Amino acid sequence: MDVFAAVKGNRAAVPSGGTFTANPITMTAGFACMEQLHQSSFERPDQIGTQVREGLVAVFAKQSLDWQVTGAGSLFRVHPHQRVVNTYRDAHLDSDEVALMESFQHRLLEREVYFSGYGMGCLNLATSDNDIEHLLKAVDDALGVVAAQ
């Protein structure tokens, strides 16, 4: 189980989504749910993912920050740098970037947005346009505070 330790040296040994990772009951339930969905249900998460990623890029530009966002479909990840990210190891943050992301996460929590400490975000069918607007405003406000620190 050492490979699942939080850090090995200064890098995560194996990233893990957590509780539901490879759980056969969860996977079966997810598959059953997907069989009931219409094709448009699969298109909506892609659309809102694109909307969020483009919105984040606009916020970073507005704040004149050298941050970036990666992702596909309903997933996105914020990176407080402009290094090329091709693998999960490329996304590894140095200690200053970790502190920056922790501050960013706390500022978002103050604005009622839960965001992982390593910058990962996940969207779903229940995500509304109002939710996206709230997220992007919270990111803009939070980055204003973080940048001023």
Describe these PLM feature segments.
Residues 1-149:
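Conserved N-terminal phosphate-binding loop of PLP-dependent enzymes in the Aspartate aminotransferase
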